[in-house]
């Protein structure tokens, strides 16, 4: 926190010294009737009367999009852990006759596999035990595990040819979200906030919500850097909303502090920050001021956003929020995502854990699909009914796929699957994506891409293109180099664009 004691006396102007004399620590905390513990800067938020002028414009760095934008916002349904494409979207009926046989060397082609299966004596082929059917006018193949998703196949583009360089969770997730396997780069949502700015001055441009699935309860952790801003200004990092009645930490007034007092506190801190900016020229001070003011406004906007009492029973039922067996956290988050989209939030990230199914996959994936199938489909249907799907891009998928061979013992009704980055499936809907298609093909074993490969950088380049952004031109100069989400690669996949 900036205090008057940070400023050398020989560097302050008369005006600054006058203000500093007024704002001694005793005077500041005495007037606000709060001790350090109850009035920490993390809690310098408030709402009574009108908010002060916004410290930052909220505009993005781009004066306008490079292309006509088809999408204005993104809802990213991230399935953490790596869903099995072979049990959900990549139908391989020919594998039934190969059950238990060794994965051919001609298919593996010497590719590395994780240490969890590299020591197995055999790599037995494990065909899915679940049935697939074709759905909609598109005739897209979808597993019986996803009956609700099957009902929206004419609205989604299923991509079966994604591939990634990483085979472990953290680097793969970091790569998908930031364009680099190494931590420290800005996330996709942060790039969009930086480039396009926010559309609502009372809510962040980038919001994150996390839920735990009923599948693998010991799934990999989700680190906050996955929605971080890296080296771009911190005002562009995501804001996590927790479940429950208090979604944002320190948003409510602490005991003994009303909105008027909070407003005065914030004004004084703003003055101190202005002095610091004048003295040191640190651009992050503007970010700090903007974040305090945004938090102040959120005291009213967030309770209104998260109040579902005005939603109809039909809407609540459509998402399955109160249904037994449907994860209320994810279902509720999907409905909140629609409400955020209505209010202009630029990037909405839902992260649902539990897909890391190395063993006991058939049992775990049933529950996991029940968690997300109905709410995901309901979100697409709800957006479409309200006229929002046209300019809202919805994305569903994880950081990689799963192997065709079984991890551990293969039995009649049980198997596990290891990590597999050579090919996996995701889908997108709305926002100018091409509906009712299946894009890309894999070989007969679902092990390698054989047509229309979509590396992660291409996927992200395509997302940016739908938002009207040339991925090669949204850059940030850091340590003498112009960085971008797609690094030095990336090719827009026109086949995914309507």
What are these regions (language model features)?
Residues 2-498:
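Ligand-binding pockets and gating/stacking loops
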């Amino acid at each position: 926190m900036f205090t008057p004691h940070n400023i050398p006396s020989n560097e302050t102007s008369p005006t600054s010294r006058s203000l500093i004399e007024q704002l001694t620590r005793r005077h500041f905390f005495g007037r606000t009737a709060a001790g350090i513990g109850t009035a920490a800067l993390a809690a310098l938020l408030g709402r009574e009367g009108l908010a002060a002028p916004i410290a930052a414009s909220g505009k993005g760095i781009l004066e306008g999009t490079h292309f006509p934008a088809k999408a204005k916002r993104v809802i990213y349904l991230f399935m953490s852990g790596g869903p099995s494409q072979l049990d959900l979207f990549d139908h391989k009926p020919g594998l039934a006759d190969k059950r238990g046989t060794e994965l051919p060397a001609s298919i593996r082609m010497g590719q590395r596999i994780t240490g969890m299966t590299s020591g197995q004596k055999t790599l037995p082929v494990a065909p899915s035990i679940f049935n697939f059917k074709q759905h909609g006018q598109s005739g897209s193949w979808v597993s019986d595990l996803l009956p609700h998703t099957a009902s929206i196949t004419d609205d989604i583009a299923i991509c079966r040819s994604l591939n990634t360089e990483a085979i472990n969770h953290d680097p793969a997730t970091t790569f998908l979200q930031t364009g680099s396997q190494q931590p420290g780069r800005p996330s996709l949502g942060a790039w969009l906030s930086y480039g396009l700015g926010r559309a609502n001055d009372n809510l962040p441009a980038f919001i994150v919500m996390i839920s735990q699935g009923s599948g693998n309860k010991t799934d990999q952790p989700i680190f906050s850097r996955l929605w971080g801003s890296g080296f771009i200004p911190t005002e562009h990092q995501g804001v996590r909303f927790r479940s429950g009645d208090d979604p944002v930490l320190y948003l409510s007034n602490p005991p003994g502090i009303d909105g008027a007092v909070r407003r005065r506190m914030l004004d004084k801190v703003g003055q101190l920050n202005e002095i610091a900016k004048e003295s040191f020229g640190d651009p992050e001070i503007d970010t700090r001021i903007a974040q305090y003011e945004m938090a102040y406004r959120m005291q009213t906007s967030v309770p209104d956003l998260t109040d579902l009492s005005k939603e109809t029973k039909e809407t609540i039922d459509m998402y399955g929020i109160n249904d037994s067996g449907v994860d209320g956290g994810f279902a509720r988050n999907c409905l909140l995502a629609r409400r955020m989209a209505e209010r202009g939030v630029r990037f909405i990230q839902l992260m649902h854990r539990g897909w890391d199914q190395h063993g006991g996959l058939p049992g775990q994936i049933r529950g996991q699909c029940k968690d997300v199938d109905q709410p995901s489909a309901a979100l697409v249907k709800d957006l479409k009914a309200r006229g929002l799907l046209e300019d809202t891009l919805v994305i569903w998928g994880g950081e990689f796929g799963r192997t065709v061979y079984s991890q551990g013992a293969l039995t009649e009704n049980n198997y596990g699957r290891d990590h597999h980055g050579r090919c996996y499936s995701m889908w997108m809907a709305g926002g100018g994506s091409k509906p009712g298609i299946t894009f890309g093909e894999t070989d007969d074993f679902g092990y390698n891409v054989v047509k229309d490969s979509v590396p992660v950088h291409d996927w992200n380049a395509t997302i940016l293109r739908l938002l009207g952004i040339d991925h090669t031109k949204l850059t940030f100069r850091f340590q003498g180099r112009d960085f971008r989400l797609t690094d030095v690669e990336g090719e827009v996949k026109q086949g995914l664009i309507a």
